[in-house]
A protein has these predicted regions:
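Mature catalytic core of soluble alpha/beta enzymes
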Residues: 1-177
């Protein structure tokens, strides 16, 4: 499940190739205690956000790319650009169609075979986002740990190598993937 406050775990798991040992159960447990969107208080009148738990953090990195792609699409459409794709680090937001075709063709990578596709999507006024454990991970003692963290347990997700979601919004597709 998506939780904007999962940023409290950003120092527990490192997915930049530098992590060589497992974090302790205690470190994970202490970090998970700082996660929970239900502890975020929004005050619209004062334009403030209050984080109830000490050490709690929020971050938009996980959905920010989709949001940026959607905003880019909206700006270009408002400027009269009739067709295009905004690619925000793999989160795509498309409108119109390319010359001499009726849809944008976007390949979905095969997580088990490099440089191979499992599907080609045809996009018009659509967005697509993919999240997967096959490109960004930590390898410890020969085992790969996904960068997709379960906010309730603090542990990397297991069982899915890749999830691709298409829909009208890259932000929402990213959220679901």
């Amino acid at each position: 499940a998506f939780d904007i406050s999962i940023v409290a775990l950003d120092k527990v798991w490192l997915f930049d190739g530098s992590m060589t040992t497992m974090p302790s159960e205690e470190v994970i447990k202490r970090s998970v205690e700082k996660v929970g969107y239900q502890h975020i208080r929004l005050d619209s009148a004062a334009s403030t956000i209050f984080l109830e738990l000490p050490g709690m953090k929020i971050g938009f990195g996980s959905i920010g790319k989709g949001y940026a792609a959607d905003r880019g699409r909206e700006i270009m459409k408002a400027k009269g650009i009739e067709a295009g794709i905004v690619n925000a680090s793999g989160d795509l937001s498309a409108w119109g169609s390319p010359p001499q075709d009726d849809a944008w063709k976007v390949g979905v990578n095969n997580p088990f075979k490099a440089h191979r596709m499992v599907k080609v999507l045809r996009l018009n006024e659509m967005a697509v986002a993919t999240s997967g454990s096959y490109e960004k991970y930590a390898e410890i003692n020969g085992k790969r740990y996904s960068h997709i963290i379960n906010p309730k347990t603090g542990w990397p997700s297991v069982g899915l190598a890749s999830v691709t979601v298409s829909g009208p919004s890259a932000e929402f597709a990213n959220f679901l993937s």
